[in-house]
Curated annotation (Swiss-Prot):
Residues 1-26 form the signal peptide. Residues 27-231 are extracellular. This is Probable syndecan. GO terms for cellular component: anchoring junction; cell surface; cytoplasm; membrane.
Amino acid sequence: MILKLNFCLSTYSVLILLSLSTQAFAANQAKTKVVPSSTISTKSLKNGISEQVEGSANIPGRLADIEVNGSGYPTDDEDGDDVHGSGKPPSSATTKSDKVTSPSHAVVTAKPTTVPTTTASFKPPVQPKPKPAANDKEIKVEEDEDDDEDEDEDDEDDEEDFADENIHNDEDFFTTTTTTTYRPIVVATTSTPRSAATNPPRQQPPMVTSTISSGPFSPFHETLANGFYAAIAGGVLVAVITAILLVLFVVFRIRKKDEGSYALDEPKQARPYASYGYTKASTKEFYA
């Protein structure tokens, strides 16, 4: 009997453990069903960020594979629209070409203005040094009547020399004009237009909060999705195990009762020691 009780208890404990493990597994399955929505939202955010190229100022709808080829015109190009050094802004044709994005091949040309710089240098006139006299002692001051005439002639000679020096010094003034010309850069943009249908706006799926819906199982749909189904399955399993154990216990008690009972139809046997006992005669009276 003790062995049977131990077997029943061990079976009951094993069944309870199985029910608990089944309930935990069902709850984990219900949680994992909610995770893919968050992963889809994170992937969509990453794809949306990867379409933008930092620092490129490109429209997100365009492709990021842009080929840039640089070429330049010589400084003596026959382009009469821009005047070097005039500060004239670029023509409207070039600004309009920057905004063209519809064709598959767009060529953008930029013609910056040239900045002229002028530098002037001055060379001071070289003054002739007076030659020293051969002998200072031989210098004599002579006064003559023609000193005034000589002074006038000297003044005229000085003026002529000064004029000649000015004529020669004009050559010393020279103007250096440095013109810095920036070569225009031709940007060849090759892009393939993409249809709007291939890039649908990615939005996070809306979270359904209302429990009212159509269908045969509409009242229970939201509760089953949140793990309520796992609790129901675990409760049903525990109830079935309890019913089985109760039936086993009832059968065990019935069998135990059958072992201690006897059939009423069987005749009673006389005890072996009854012949040695005192028996009263049925026809005689007994007197003490």
